[in-house]
Design a protein with these regions (language model features):
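Predominantly flavin-linked oxidoreductase catalytic cores and closely associated redox partners
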Residues: 113-287, 291-292
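Feature captures the FAD/FMN-dependent oxidoreductase FAD-binding
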Residues: 73-147
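N-terminal FAD cofactor-binding segment of flavoenzymes
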Residues: 21-83, 375-386
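A short alpha-helix-loop-beta-strand transition element characteristic
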Residues: 63-67, 71, 79-92, 152-161, ...
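Internal hydrophobic alpha-helix adjacent to the cofactor/substrate pocket in enzyme cavities
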Residues: 350-371
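C-terminal auxiliary extensions adjacent to catalytic cores
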Residues: 394-438
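A glycine-rich dinucleotide-binding beta-alpha-beta segment and adjacent secondary-structure elements
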Residues: 278-282, 286-344, 351-353, 371-387, ...
Length: 438
């Protein structure tokens, strides 16, 4: 068997593990560098790889949803992250949610047991020689950030993500809550906590006036919309919450048969159903304030909080000025970046960037012809978005149909149009799968 050059991957998060896996299964030796367990970022709590620090949901599974399309593309292309997610999923209606501990352990064990992957523990503070994929994440250490800054000659852009609290299932007052999924889709997997107009008013007022934990450099204007702290959301207007994360439409209270004034949904956080997270309630309030404010919700009056929400720094590159559509540094193509540091936002999006970076590097090492990735697939559309030099003010982006090429013909109905875009994408993915078959 031919001996290929070793590729270094920095960071064993979702993107780094996916990149390492795509290289390793193609017989390319990988050095996977991870600073845990020697050092952890402020948002990490375990020594596992691919630790989920925000929600436990990988979002919709439906092909009429761009997140569902992206997962299906990766699933067909033998993604490690999606495979492990499928194995450790918990009930969540039409979404793919996972038992976060089982998921991380599954990824960790798979990576550690592959003979082509060598784990190098410890913090990386400078660029390794040879081909390298930097997947150090949104919480890149100060030392590596300095090395990247010196290499690219550009300033990073920074913002902050927030994680939601988790409560025990047994502490939820089910006499004041009910099980349902919106519009009755799928199985009734969410616990719904209704609020009257008076209760909503009290909850919102408490949110707006609660004391926040100190966060260096935090500014409301820099908060990414997809992971906005609930208290920042509340300040934007009286009805912002009830038209957003507390939207009651499609969730009638079985006691009245009518939609409540507002509803907080709780989503299962582990396979056993013993833990639930507060959907959309990412926060950076002080811990004591979190308990006080969320206990205003009747069903959570006596809730036991096993994890409070935390706020953490997120750092990403001005990628359109730096990267090509394979995530390679234009000025030094031996270097690729992957994951949220590139400006893709979300778990599956991070895995997708790691997949493309790892696969493309593997093809280069093996001196095989490269693939053309365009906006007709979700994987390609993300790569094209982060490398689009026409974007003046670059901001992180979740996958969405707006970044994919539209159809060349008109289709009646948004859902059907999206389904046809997905069908086109998956046909392309199937042809790619044939070309890269192991």
């Amino acid at each position: 068997m031919k001996q290929y050059e070793t590729v270094t991957v920095v960071g064993a998060g979702l993107a780094g593990c996916e990149a390492a896996w795509q290289l390793a299964i193609r017989d390319i030796p990988v050095q996977l560098c991870e600073m845990k367990p020697m050092k952890r970022s402020p948002a990490h709590h375990t020594d596992n790889f691919a630790e989920l620090v925000c929600s436990n949901s990988l979002r919709s599974n439906e092909l009429s949803n761009a997140a569902g399309l992206l997962k299906e593309e990766l699933r067909r292309l033998d993604s490690l992250i999606v495979t492990c997610a499928d194995k450790t999923q918990v009930e969540a209606g039409g979404a793919l949610a996972v038992d976060r501990t089982a998921f991380a352990q599954s990824v960790t064990n798979t990576i550690k047991n592959h003979p082509n992957i060598t784990i190098i523990p410890g913090e990386i503070t400078e660029f390794p020689d040879g081909r390298v994929i930097i997947a150090s994440g949104p919480l890149t250490s100060d030392a590596l950030s300095a090395a990247i800054h010196e290499k690219i000659g550009k300033e990073f852009l920074s913002f902050y993500d927030a994680a939601a609290p988790i409560v025990t299932a047994e502490s939820i007052d089910m006499t004041r809550a009910y099980l349902a999924s919106r519009y009755g889709k799928g199985t009734p997997d969410y616990i719904n906590c209704p609020l009257s107009a008076e209760e909503y008013h009290a909850f919102r007022e408490a949110l707006c006036t609660a004391e926040e934990a100190p966060v260096h450099g935090f500014e409301d204007s820099k908060v990414f919309e997809g992971c906005m702290p609930v208290e920042v959301n509340a300040r934007r207007g009286y009805d912002t919450l009830r038209y957003g994360i507390l939207k009651p439409i499609g969730l009638p209270d079985p006691k009245t048969g009518k939609d409540p004034f507002a509803v907080l949904q709780l989503r299962r956080d582990n396979a056993q159903g013993s833990l639930y997270n507060l959907v959309g309630c990412q926060t950076h309030l002080k811990f004591g304030e979190q308990k006080r404010v969320f206990s205003i919700i009747p069903a959570l009056a006596n809730a036991e909080f096993v994890r409070y929400g935390v706020m953490h720094r997120n750092t990403f590159l001005d990628s359109p000025r730096l990267l090509d559509n394979t995530y390679a540094l234009r000025t030094e193509p031996r270097i690729r970046f992957a994951g949220q540091i590139t400006g893709v936002e979300g778990y599956v999006e991070s895995a997708a960037s790691g997949f493309l970076a790892g696969l493309t590097t593997a093809l280069e090492v093996q001196e095989k012809s490269s693939l053309i990735w365009n906006r007709q697939t979700a994987i390609g559309a993300l790569a094209c978005y982060v490398s689009d030099h026409t974007i003046n003010k670059f901001q992180p982006m979740n996958v969405n149909f707006g970044i994919l090429d539209p159809l060349a013909y008109r289709v009646k109905g948004k859902r059907e149009k999206n389904n046809q875009i997905s069908a086109r994408a998956l046909a392309i993915i199937d042809s790619i799968k044939e070309r890269i078959a192991l």
